[in-house]
Amino acid sequence: MNNTYRIPSKEFMDFTAFQRREVTKLAKEFVDIVHEYGKEAMMFLGDHWIGMEPFMDEFKSVGLDAVVGSVGNGATLRLISDIPGVKYTEGRFLPYFFPDTFHEGGDPVKEAKVNWVTARRAILRKPIDRIGYGGYLKLAVQFPEFIDYVESVCKEFRTLYENIKGTTPYCVKTVAVLNCWGKMRAWGNHMVHHAIYHKQNYSYAGIMEALSGAPFDVRFITFDDIRKNPDMLKDIDVILNVGDGDTAYTGGDNWTDETIVSAINEFVYNGGGFIGIGERPVISGKANTFS
């Protein structure tokens, strides 16, 4: 059993590569059947997508036409809108038309406003192509103020999309988030469940949220990426290493590798910025930590 906080072993990474190869192969069979009937194939990016990590190369081979997912904040929006190799992306905004919100005394308008304003800043960096809502329409129709607000959101989205789509937003700097996962977990760093607050990680998740709408070209890189090509750092202005000490997000024993240390030292010596947030990486067998 593994989770995104545990530092992955080579065996585990090999297994994830096996999963991607086999799952995407099977998924392509389903997509081909859909296409044979002249229909588009859309995947819902939900709480579980093992083997279908959308930023990995194998995903492109599936041939999906579109991806839709629930938008809880800016980071979850970028998790959808940044997906390459599909014709279009769609965000399903909150709240869902469910009884937990749409009941007597409930305030769906407030939830909708918070959701829209939170996600909107990320749309300005990389827009999704379509938006929608989901749930039981018979519940939503009982709240006419909510219907009116959704109409205003749709109009605002169209205005933003018409002015942004196809353009490259201004970027002050190129920022790379360095950890053990890289693009496999792009925009999903420190995300437990779906944009849900957790005391243990909200500060780290908040950094991803800030980046989702900030004027930066954000990349997600791994220690292995640096090992394979140290020169990749020449295209980066700032490296972020964010997380608790003994986790995949800071890197652990990766910092004992002279290739990594030398590459980072050279990067900083040549004017690059390195920002560590949280704890220093914990190196096994040593009382001190990397500094």
What are these regions (language model features)?
Residues 76, 247-249, 283:
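Short glycine-rich, flexible loops that bind phosphorylated cofactors or substrates
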Residues 43-51, 208-235:
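A short, well-structured beta->alpha microelement
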Residues 251-291:
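A glycine-rich, often tryptophan-bearing local segment used as a flexible ligand/cofactor-contacting loop or short
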